[in-house]
Each structure stands twice: as C-alpha cells, then as structure tokens.
C-alpha cells in the first residue's frame, strides 16, 4: 500500500500518473475507513482527494504554504503528511487526529487552526505579505470551497489579495454545494463559468483583477497536475477554479450530498447507519411548530445561515415553508443585519444559529439589531458542554458575549413547554430583540403550567423555597440543579431552587429576598463562567455576607474534550457541587 509508506509529500514526487491514481484511491479508502468508524466530514473530503494529491505532487510543502478554508476537506492532506495511522489504525489512533487542520498536531504542514468558514484567503494574504517583505519565494495557496464564498471575509480576502498584486494562488473547489445548497448571487456567475468551461464574458474573478484558470474535470489527477503546474511560481494573484463532485467515489454521498456532508459512523458497504433512537429533538419540534404557525402568520420567517438543519429545516420542510424560510449561505453577519431589517419592516424573523457562530456576528447583533431595538428573535442552538467539542467549534461563550450587549434579552428555558412559551412571547412582542438559548440536555417536559408572559425586566422563578442554600440553575443546567437539591436534602439541607429564566441581568428583588435566611448561593450555567450569568450574581452580592459559588466552565480553548471530564475538571459533577456546598457551609 503506497500511503503506508508516504511520510511526507516528497514521497509523491517520483510517482507516475498511474501510481498517483492508486495513491488517490488508497487515500479515499483511508478517509472512508475513518469516517465509517469514527464519524466526521464525508462529502467534502471525498471530493477533494485528487486535488490534494495533485497539490502535494506539484507544490513543495512545507516550503509552499497550503491554507485550507474551514479545513473540513483536509483529511486527504493529513493522510499524505505522515498521519495515515489516524485513518487506518485503531479508534485510539483516529481519536488522536483532529478533524480540522491543526498546527498543534502537525506544525510542519498545518499552518493554521481553522474550523470556521471564509477565512483562508485572508489568512493567506498575511502569509503573502510576510513573504513579500522577507523577499522569499514560496507559493501561497488558499483553498476555498464555493460554499465558503458566501461569507463576507472571503470577499475581503479577495479584495486584499488583488490589492497586494503579488503571487497568490486561490483554488476554488466548486462542488456546487455548501453544507446544503448554495444561496447568493455569486453562484449565478459560478454556474455560468462552469457551463462555459470558464470562458463566459462576465467573470467576477477577472473583474477583481485575478488571473483565472478553469478546470471542469476537478477529480482528474493528470489534468489537475497540469493546471497547478501552470500557475506554480506565479507572481500575480491567480484563481484556479476546479469543478469537483462532493462525495466523489462513494455512491451514497454523491446521491445525497447534504445528508453526507458530515455524519456519524456508518456501514461502508451500503451507507446505512444505525437507526436513530426515537426521542424528541428541539430541531424537529421547532421546525414543526414554525411550519404550523406559518400557516396562520405570513409574516413569520425562519432564517438560517448555511445550517438549515440546525433549525430542523430539512429539504422537505424548506419546500413546505417556501418564501417563509430564507437561508443566506454561510453569512452570519448578513443574517443578523437582515433580520433587523425584516423586523423593522414588520416581519417576525426567527434566526436559528449555533452558539459557536455567534462570535462571527457580534458587531451586527450589537449595532444593527440592538442599538436599533428591532424586535428580531435569535434562536441559539448547541450552547453548552454537550455540543460540538473541537477547539474551533467550542459552544461555551455565547452567554458572556450576548449578555454583554445592552438592549438584548437573553432567555434560558429549562424545558419544552417553557421554550415554546418564551418563543411565542418573543415573536409577539414588538419592543426589543430577544435571544433564546435552546436546551442541549435533551427534551424535558414541564410538570406544572409554565408562564406565558415574560416581561422586559428580569424575573426569576422560585420553584421551591427552602433556607440556608439557594441554587440558581439556568437553562440546560436546571435539571442538574434539581438533582443537587435532592442530594442536599439527603444531607438535611432544604435548598431553595430557582429558575432564573433571564441570563442577561439579575432579579434584584429575588436576590435581596434570599438574604434573610440564606447564607450560600450556588449558580449553575452551561457555559463559560468568566463574564457569565453567575458572575453577575456574585457581583450583585458584592461585600454582603452572602457567599456565592459560581458554577460554570473556566475560560479556555478546549479541544476534543469529553463532556463529563470537562465537568469534573470544573467541579460541576452533581456530587462535587454538593461537596463544595457542604464545605462552604462548614467553613
């Protein structure tokens, strides 16, 4: 097997086309071996195998610099840079390899830690400028998918690369897909370029000042080598536009490109996956609720930014929603500003966005939405430890970020009924923007009626009144708070249990009301505690006699963490919380 002997791209240099094709076939097999057992990005990697082999054959990494956009297509690159064991070895070997480019893992060949979209060209322009200042001659190659071109930073990178005017190669990997279908006017020109074999008169890359080459057969190694050789050493900004097939070489991934963008382990023979457990999900509940409400309210608009299934909007449901669902591609800044405009114009937009992508649009939420007090609704999903766990996709920072913005209410429902009551109120009110943090600890149901109205001033809900100890448990950690209260009861402590509901500000009346017969307050939040909900409560009590234990995750860049281990490291296992409370009461 060739790839077991390939320790670096230099080992490809002496191979002929036939041998390189075998390398590509073996690399594709290695990728399938990993993703079928370990899960991961399927379609993006399978479609970029031949291009990766050709790039490493033509260029001279690590001298020449490859910068991957998102880097969810870098598995073949890893196979060819000494990490084949992470694709052919044991599960432990696979666990040792990140699903994204990682200098911590391989500083020689992985230039940046990357996981979010539209960044490669901008990063590459930095390397371009550094090379030009130092007077060296390495090739700088940015690799970006057509889906990532919907993001604003990609436009900014193209603008700067053209302005610099020196050698940079931008490989546009055009598979006619984002995670789902592409959205945006740019794709009309990409289609025209594909249909004309790159010759149509209106070429937006040329208009930007780039040299341009098109290759229709983007999965043909021999032709890829020729086009890459033709631009190697260029002293001009150059785009190489290659037309590839997402999922190439694996029929199920070709047949259903959206479903096979990323996936859990599967049977390689037929692409079948273990049946999903028959449990409720907020994605399914939300999309069904929205579709039902849309029948009666034509102003209700479901908004997504490249991840429609995060809102439960499958292709079938997107068709049912019609014009009442809009996806703007991977463009969170556009989404935030657009929902502000929609709300100003009398619509009721609900934008579903992953916690990890909030940071991509902080400015637009603060400036375009909150300063204008437009009553848009932001539906934050995936926030907390039981979510994505790669260093580039940490979902722990949305509470500190959103709660730092004046003019935004951030609600934390604890169960299904409370979530939909809050959602209905947020849509109906017309005074200010509302964000909701969708629980990530499964769908729990209320055991008593929930409130249907939520005011603009924070109002905590005391679920049980005890004494000495008060547990204020927010959102996904409410059930944890319930269990901690039961454990404390076993030790003779009748703890007060509070559902705060509001994350962005404190309920002074409720907190002051605890001072008379409580000595200890525990706050629990499923996210970063630095700048978070609990620290606001600790600050409120200040120099008073009340002791406050702030429960949350310490600020950090955690990578591929185990949720229970992270909780344990932060003293957030239920038994640890009880131990700390007992110790605090005794000290």
What residues fall within each predicted segment?
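Cofactor-/ligand-binding subdomain signature composed of acidic, glycine-rich
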Residues: 1-34, 252-268
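Glycine/charged-rich beta-loop-alpha catalytic/anionic-binding loops adjacent to active sites
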Residues: 29-36, 96-113, 136-141, 314-326, ...
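Cofactor-binding active-site loop characterized by glycine-rich and histidine/acidic residues
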Residues: 41-164, 300, 305, 314-315
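Acidic, glycine-rich active-site loops and adjacent beta-strand->loop/helix elements
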Residues: 70-75, 144-151, 172-178, 218-219, ...
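A glycine-rich helix N-cap at a beta->alpha junction
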Residues: 87-97, 163-177, 370-382
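Glycine-rich ThDP/TPP pyrophosphate-binding loop and its adjacent helix/strand module
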Residues: 110-267, 271-279, 283-288, 408-518
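Non-catalytic terminal/interface segments that mediate subunit docking, oligomerization
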Residues: 250-359, 364-374, 472-475
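Peripheral docking tails and interdomain loops at the edges
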Residues: 265, 273-278, 387-389, 409, ...
């Amino acid at each position: 097997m060739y790839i077991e002997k390939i320790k670096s791209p230099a080992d490809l240099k002496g191979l002929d086309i036939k041998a390189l094709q075998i390398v590509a076939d073996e690399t594709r097999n290695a990728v399938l071996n990993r993703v079928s057992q370990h899960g991961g990005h399927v379609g993006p990697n399978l479609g970029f195998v031949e291009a990766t082999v050709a790039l490493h054959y033509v260029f001279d990494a690590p001298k020449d610099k490859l910068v991957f956009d998102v880097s969810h297509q870098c598995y073949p690159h890893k196979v060819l840079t000494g990490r084949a064991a992470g694709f052919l070895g044991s599960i432990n070997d696979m666990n040792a390899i990140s699903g994204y480019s990682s200098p911590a893992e391989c500083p020689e060949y992985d230039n940046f830690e990357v996981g979010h979209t539209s960044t490669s060209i901008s990063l590459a322009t930095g390397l371009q400028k550094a090379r030009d200042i130092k007077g060296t001659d390495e090739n700088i190659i940015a690799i970006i998918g057509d889906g990532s071109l919907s993001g604003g930073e990609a436009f900014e990178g193209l603008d700067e690369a053209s302005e610099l005017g020196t050698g940079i190669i931008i490989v546009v990997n055009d598979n006619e897909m984002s995670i789902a279908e592409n959205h945006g006017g740019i794709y009309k020109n990409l289609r025209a370029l594909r249909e004309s074999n790159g010759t149509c008169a209106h070429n937006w890359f040329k208009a930007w000042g780039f040299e341009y080459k098109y290759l229709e057969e983007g999965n043909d190694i021999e032709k890829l080598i020729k086009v890459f050789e033709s631009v190697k050493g260029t002293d001009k900004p150059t785009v190489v536009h290659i037309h590839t097939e997402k999922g190439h070489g694996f029929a199920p991934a070709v047949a259903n490109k959206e479903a096979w963008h990323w996936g859990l382990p599967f049977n390689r023979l037929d692409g079948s996956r273990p049946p999903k457990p028959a449990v409720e999900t907020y994605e399914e509940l939300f999309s069904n609720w929205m579709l039902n409400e849309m029948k009666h309210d034509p102003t209700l608009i479901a908004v997504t930014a490249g991840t429609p299934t995060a809102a439960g909007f499958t292709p079938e449901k997107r068709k049912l929603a019609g014009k009442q669902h809009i996806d703007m591609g991977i463009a969170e800044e556009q989404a935030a500003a657009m929902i502000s405009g929609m709300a100003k114009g009398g619509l009721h937009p609900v934008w579903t966005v992953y916690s990890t992508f909030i940071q991509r649009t902080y400015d637009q939420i603060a400036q375009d939405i909150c300063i204008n007090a437009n009553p848009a609704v932001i539906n934050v999903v995936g926030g907390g430890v039981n979510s994505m766990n790669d260093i580039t996709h940490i979902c722990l920072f949305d509470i500190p970020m959103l709660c730092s913005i004046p003019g935004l209410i951030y609600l934390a429902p604890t169960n299904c009924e409370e979530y939909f009551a809050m959602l209905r109120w947020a849509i109906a009110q017309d005074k200010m923007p509302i964000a909701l943090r969708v629980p990530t600890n499964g769908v729990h149901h209320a055991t008593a009626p929930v409130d249907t109205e939520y005011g603009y001033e924070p109002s905590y809900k005391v679920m049980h009144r005890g004494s000495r100890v008060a547990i204020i448990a927010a959102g996904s950690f409410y059930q944890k708070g319930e269990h901690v209260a039961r454990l404390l009861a076993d030790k003779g402590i009748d703890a007060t249990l509070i559902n705060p509901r509001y994350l962005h500000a404190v309920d002074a009346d409720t907190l002051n009301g605890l001072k008379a017969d409580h000595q200890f307050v525990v706050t629990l939040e499923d996210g970063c505690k630095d700048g978070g909900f609990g620290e606001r409560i600790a600050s409120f009590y200040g120099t008073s006699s009340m002791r406050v234990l702030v429960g949350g995750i310490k600020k950090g860049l955690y990578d591929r963490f185990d949720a229970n281990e992270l909780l344990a490291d932060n003293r957030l296992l239920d038994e640890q919380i009880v131990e700390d409370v007992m110790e605090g009461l005794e000290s």
